[in-house]
């Protein structure tokens, strides 16, 4: 890389301004995803496996549907929608209306009905991988739940009474039993305990043998989650990464390796200027799985389709601190 290009890269770094996360968005993300690290691994408790943020292909909508939490045991598969809503929640049939403290209303789909579509997409995905072959697999093994985590949400009786709805007070009984290992981990353990309790009382007739259950765990573990970009300043973009462009090379998402973190290391201060002037070290670098470190320049970018946007956009890597592959 030439001296001029190194200096241009450092100047572009100096011009970048930190982008901070909105406090309300940050709270919602922390409350609903619980533990960011379980998105790249999975959580086990009392023989049950819990996976978060899995996005299952839905041919009917020609898109992926996200399932917040999936709890697996040999007897039962629980598909769980997690919400941290506050205010009041009313049942209006096809929609649920949330009235927040300020009086504004938000219309949500009926989560019970919406979960049925996600269940069908999940079963279809299992069948494509040689699992869930029986016609009555869903009836014998699957349950759907909606978990409301926020104690400041008042839920209308018609919603709260539904057997597939878990309000915070119902979960609190299990939450109090968990050892103090951090709120998020206690919450996850409580969700699993609730599912195990439901399993014992529901009388499900299915029971997967060890080999088939292991195949099920692997199949769910391999389902994609969201990709994320952590920007300079802390704001996180969630969506789908399409391509990474470094120098003359373009890598599609599938070429970037398995899920995990790809730090984008920049020397933004005086040390970066020293590197640019002397050529000793790299102003910016990233390391992909199984590859040597790649030197970064001002022209390098990433093609990313953020949630809520109508089309992908190209973001300069000078704005990015970390790529999280889902």
Where are these regions (language model features)?
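Surface-exposed interaction regions that form or flank ligand-binding interfaces
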Residues: 1-65, 101-326
